């Protein structure tokens, strides 16, 4: 089980889900980037950016969310577990990792990812995580065991509306909070959705990844407000909200 530095919980407190919401879920957009705004050395390459302190912070954040969403590119590149390893606020040995973990949500319109044989399946089978929801635009020919498929209608640009995704997660799965971790296409789209994002939490690692890296750069200007900074051993973390 992981612990977090004592100064992180008070720093993050005002940016966590408040638990008193009607309508769409509380949404936290969070990711780690290099100094040159890259989230990976190359597309499809798993890349270490942040210090162990901020990796532990990620698990702390997961504890406070009902769901955790990533895109198909990230799940294919990283094979993540998407569970929560934080020890919890009460250090309760009877609280299982499965209970503490958010529900994984995979945005996979073309059904490129397979749950079978994944790290997620392994953790779920061990009682250390939850089975995923896969958001897609078509009914799979063969449905994988323990996977729930959320079939969504794409728009004229062959994209799924983020508002529709969040509304459906709340209505059909009672998700009051969702943490979104990437990848770049997901992040760049959501940075333009100030009406849907409640908190933005960005870790900046002490590394440059170079010109071939995968860049976070939304298509237009994005202004932030309510900004706070935290300094760790080798990373800094920025918490903020998007201006309307």
Swiss-Prot record:
Positions annotated to bind NADP(+): 74, 78, 160, 183-187
Disulfide bridge map: none
Protein's GO biological process: riboflavin biosynthetic process
Pathway the protein takes part in: Cofactor biosynthesis; riboflavin biosynthesis
Pfam families membership: RibD_C
Enzymatic reactions: 2,5-diamino-6-(1-D-ribitylamino)pyrimidin-4(3H)-one 5'-phosphate + NADP(+) = 2,5-diamino-6-(1-D-ribosylamino)pyrimidin-4(3H)-one 5'-phosphate + NADPH + H(+); 2,5-diamino-6-(1-D-ribitylamino)pyrimidin-4(3H)-one 5'-phosphate + NAD(+) = 2,5-diamino-6-(1-D-ribosylamino)pyrimidin-4(3H)-one 5'-phosphate + NADH + H(+)
Enzyme nomenclature, EC number: 1.1.1.302
Any one GO molecular-function label of the UniProt entry: oxidoreductase activity, acting on the CH-OH group of donors, NAD or NADP as acceptor
Family matches, as InterPro entries: DHFR-like_dom_sf (IPR024072), RibD_C (IPR011549), RibDG_C (IPR002734), Riboflavin_Biosynth_HTPR (IPR050765)
Keywords from the UniProt entry: NADP, Oxidoreductase, Riboflavin biosynthesis
Top-level taxon: Eukaryota
The UniProt record lists the keyword NADP: yes
Additional free-text comment from the UniProt record: Using chirally deuterated NADPH, the enzyme was shown to be A-type reductase catalyzing the transfer of deuterium from the 4(R) position of NADPH to the 1' (S) position of the substrate.
Reported function: Catalyzes an early step in riboflavin biosynthesis, the NADPH-dependent reduction of the ribose side chain of 2,5-diamino-6-ribosylamino-4(3H)-pyrimidinone 5'-phosphate, yielding 2,5-diamino-6-ribitylamino-4(3H)-pyrimidinone 5'-phosphate.
Complex and partners: Homodimer.
Family assignment from sequence similarity: Belongs to the HTP reductase family.
Listed name of the protein: 2,5-diamino-6-ribosylamino-4(3H)-pyrimidinone 5'-phosphate reductase
Organism in which the protein naturally occurs: Candida glabrata (strain ATCC 2001 / BCRC 20586 / JCM 3761 / NBRC 0622 / NRRL Y-65 / CBS 138) (Yeast)
